[in-house]
């Protein structure tokens, strides 16, 4: 990935965020955040009181009320600034994507073939189902599927990756994205979306936050914050008659200051910024999430379904050996295996052709001159091969070949069964080759487990996350690789139906499941999973079924996605703990100052030794505003994340953010009080 990363406090973003923060002072914008709306209402009320005192309409200290009013406005402004800065970072990322969208013309074909007559039309007029021809140097005008041709495509504008990729008809690499550029050859593309619905349009909308809705956890936390605000509002309202009855009524300004300091303004002011920043961090990892709900779900995941190839292993399985059946010589097996692999463009297929050439000098045959029919691999048949003259050669998984042999009246030899087990026990993948109903032998495909993957799985296990390896290999091979990699469980000989059933089984147990996929056959399982990361190189069906798209098409990214989700939840929880713990210190500052004249016994609570009642109240209000500014970097970057169990994580957060939330305000309020006294403002 080479996408430019934004600095946390980019000067241009700071200026724009300040402007947006002022715009957000409107009551319509404030109403979306009930906690900060109360602060906004208090700011308006104290401003009106200040004006009334200045004009002599009511008695009171206009200077004290005015300063309190000013810092209440700063509190609202700082909360707006945090949200605007988070949104500004997202909008900056979106603007880089908007630069990809270019007004262009498209060659709309009148028939679905490359030599059909074409009409030049604006790309904006293309509709779902239209067929277009795109040549070298052209911008692909729409999202779609390649139905003819093959070409190298520059997707750097979307993925940030400079290396071109191959897109061709058929298979799992037929999906193309509007806004990318053809570097060579040509493609005939069937548009799969209408204008405004392209992947790029959806990316921009998601990144800008225009479609951001509150997640379930955000809603639950907002309800808690509203409940606390109502409780403190009622408690504060009852204090006026108590103080009046005592003969020294507390001023409205002091009551407003008390209310603002007691309600959870810190988390209330940063909550929206945390959610926006979580989406932004996900994009920083080159993953597009369809919603904050998907990011949040990633933090709650406790089961990871991981494809073996490319995620757990390096994914470049190579043919290492030909093991013939009894009565078959190795050259005959190698010749049949090479024939069955001539049209197989997978790394495994090409390695079989090369191994046969190296071992027995078997040259690749001219495919056209063979007049053969090639049988492609499918997830259902789990085998591929060739029909040539009267020969029917197949290679595939053990079970698939066994069914094929038995359906043709043959018998699966015991010695081949033993060879399959021997290969599987070594952690290699056995492919069986058959001609007609006669089993010729086994091809061994070796793969290598990625370095450090076992340690990563151990960390996930410590966090309470179960890892399940998904593979098309037989049980013996799967068990050997699972043991080497250190996963908790595995699903061998996996079919799309088996994946879907496994996800439903875990969900029935109340667990949240995450998985990756890139093919059309993965779409049902992706749609069922709670967190479904589709590969950008995959099919349109897979991308539509998932709730995230990995622009790097790296299956290992699923682990990073879970880390980002957990970091967002931890950030929200940690700052909530800090915010509520803050109230205790502010209680010790304001209560004695506000009511000591009525109830002198309350002076015992002035443990900080604050200079005067006015300086105590003002210090608490100033600290309440400034702490939001100091916590903005933490809200945007997220708290430090370490793979720990839930109980260990809770203890750690209580010590750091609970105890910190108690201690920091005592120190901060006292320092501000001393400064106010030195400046003669106390």
Curated annotation (Swiss-Prot):
Membrane topology, from the record: Multi-pass membrane protein
Residues noted as binding ATP in the record, renumbered to the chain: 344, 348, 377-384, 395
Keyword set includes Amino-acid biosynthesis: no
Catalytic residues of the enzyme: 307
Location in or out of the cell: Cell inner membrane
Gene Ontology cellular component terms for the protein in this record: plasma membrane
Annotated CDD domains: P-type_ATPase_K
Enzyme class label: translocase
Residues given in the record as Mg(2+) binding sites: 518, 522
Segments traversing the membrane: 34-54, 58-78, 219-239, 254-274, 588-608, 616-636, 662-682
EC number: 7.2.2.6
UniProt KW keywords: ATP-binding, Cell inner membrane, Cell membrane, Ion transport, Magnesium, Membrane, Metal-binding, Nucleotide-binding, Phosphoprotein, Potassium, Potassium transport, Translocase, Transmembrane, Transmembrane helix, Transport
Gene Ontology terms for molecular function: ATP binding; ATP hydrolysis activity; magnesium ion binding; P-type potassium transmembrane transporter activity
Catalytic activity as recorded in UniProt: K(+)(out) + ATP + H2O = K(+)(in) + ADP + phosphate + H(+)
Pfam family membership, one: Hydrolase
InterPro entries xref list: ATPase_P-typ_cyto_dom_N, ATPase_P-typ_P_site, ATPase_P-typ_TM_dom_sf, ATPase_P-typ_transduc_dom_A_sf, HAD-like_sf, HAD_sf, P-type_ATPase_bsu_IA, P_typ_ATPase
Recorded family membership: Belongs to the cation transport ATPase (P-type) (TC 3.A.3) family. Type IA subfamily.
Quaternary assembly: The system is composed of three essential subunits: KdpA, KdpB and KdpC.
Its job: Part of the high-affinity ATP-driven potassium transport (or Kdp) system, which catalyzes the hydrolysis of ATP coupled with the electrogenic transport of potassium into the cytoplasm. This subunit is responsible for energy coupling to the transport system and for the release of the potassium ions to the cytoplasm.
Protein name per its UniProtKB record: Potassium-transporting ATPase ATP-binding subunit
Organism: Salmonella paratyphi B (strain ATCC BAA-1250 / SPB7)
């Amino acid at each position: 990935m080479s996408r430019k990363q934004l600095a946390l406090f980019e000067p241009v973003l700071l200026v724009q965020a300040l402007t947006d923060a002022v715009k957000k002072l409107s009551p319509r914008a404030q109403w979306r955040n009930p906690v900060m709306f109360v602060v906004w209402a208090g700011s308006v009320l104290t401003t009106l009181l200040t004006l009334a005192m200045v004009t002599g309409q009511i008695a009171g200290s206009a200077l004290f009320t005015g300063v309190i009013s000013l810092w209440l406005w700063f509190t609202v402004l700082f909360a707006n600034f945090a949200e605007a800065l988070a949104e500004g970072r997202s909008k900056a990322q979106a603007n880089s994507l908007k630069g990809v969208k270019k007004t262009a013309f498209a060659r709309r074909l009148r028939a679905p073939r490359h030599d059909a007559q074409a009409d030049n039309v604006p790309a904006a007029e293309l509709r779902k189902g239209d067929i277009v021809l795109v040549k070298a140097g052209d911008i692909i005008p729409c999202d779609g599927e390649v139905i003819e041709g093959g070409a190298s495509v520059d997707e750097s504008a979307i993925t940030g990756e400079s290396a071109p990729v191959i897109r061709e008809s058929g298979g799992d690499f037929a999906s193309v994205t509007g806004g990318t550029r053809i570097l060579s050859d040509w493609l005939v593309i069937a548009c799969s979306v209408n204008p405004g619905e392209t992947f790029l349009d959806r990316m921009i909308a998601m990144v800008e936050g225009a479609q951001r809705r509150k997640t379930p956890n955000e809603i639950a936390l907002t309800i808690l914050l509203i409940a606390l605000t109502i409780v403190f509002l009622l408690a504060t309202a009852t204090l006026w008659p108590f103080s009046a009855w005592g003969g020294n009524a507390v001023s409205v300004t002091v009551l407003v200051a008390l209310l603002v300091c007691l309600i959870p303004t810190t988390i209330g002011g940063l909550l929206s910024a945390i959610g926006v920043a979580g989406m932004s961090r996900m994009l920083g990892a080159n993953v597009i999430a369809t919603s904050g709900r998907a990011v949040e779900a990633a933090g709650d995941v406790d089961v990871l379904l991981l494809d073996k190839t490319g995620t757990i292993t390096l994914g470049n399985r190579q043919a290492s050996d030909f093991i013939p059946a009894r009565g078959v010589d190795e050259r005959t097996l190698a010749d049949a295996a090479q024939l069955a692999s001539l049209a197989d463009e997978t790394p495994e297929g090409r390695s079989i052709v090369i191994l046969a050439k190296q071992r027995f000098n078997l040259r690749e045959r001219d495919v056209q001159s063979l007049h053969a029919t090639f049988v492609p691999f499918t997830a259902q048949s789990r085998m591929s091969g060739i029909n040539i003259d009267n020969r029917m050669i197949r290679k595939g998984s053990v079970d698939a070949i066994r069914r094929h042999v038995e359906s043709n009246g043959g018998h699966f030899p015991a010695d081949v069964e033993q060879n399959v087990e021997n290969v599987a026990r070594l952690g290699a993948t056995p492919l069986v080759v058959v001609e007609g109903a006669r089993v010729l032998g086994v091809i061994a495909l070796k793969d290598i487990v990625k370095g450090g993957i076992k340690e990563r799985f151990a960390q996930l296990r410590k966090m309470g996350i179960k890892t399940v390896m998904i593979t098309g290999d037989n049980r013996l091979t799967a068990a050997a690789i699972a043991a080497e990699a250190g996963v908790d469980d595995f699903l061998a000989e996996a079919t799309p139906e088996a994946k879907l059933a496994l996800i439903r089984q875990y969900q029935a147990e109340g667990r949240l499941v995450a998985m990756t996929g890139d093919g059309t056959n993965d779409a049902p399982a992706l749609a069922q999973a709670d967190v479904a990361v589709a590969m950008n190189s995959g099919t349109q069906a897979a991308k539509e079924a998932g709730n995230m798209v990995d622009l790097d098409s790296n299956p290992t990214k699923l682990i990073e996605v879970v880390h980002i989700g957990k970091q967002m939840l931890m950030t929200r929880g940690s700052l909530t703990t800090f915010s509520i713990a803050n109230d205790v210190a502010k209680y010790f500052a304001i209560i004695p100052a506000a009511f000591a004249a009525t109830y002198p016994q309350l002076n015992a609570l002035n443990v900080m030794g604050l200079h005067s009642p006015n300086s105590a109240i003002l210090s608490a209000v100033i600290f309440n505003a400034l702490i939001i500014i100091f916590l903005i970097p933490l809200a945007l970057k997220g708290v430090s994340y370490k793979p720990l169990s839930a109980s260990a994580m809770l203890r750690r957060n209580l010590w750091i953010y609970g105890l910190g939330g108690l201690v920091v305000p005592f120190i901060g309020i006292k320092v501000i009080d001393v400064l106010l006294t030195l400046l003669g403002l106390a």
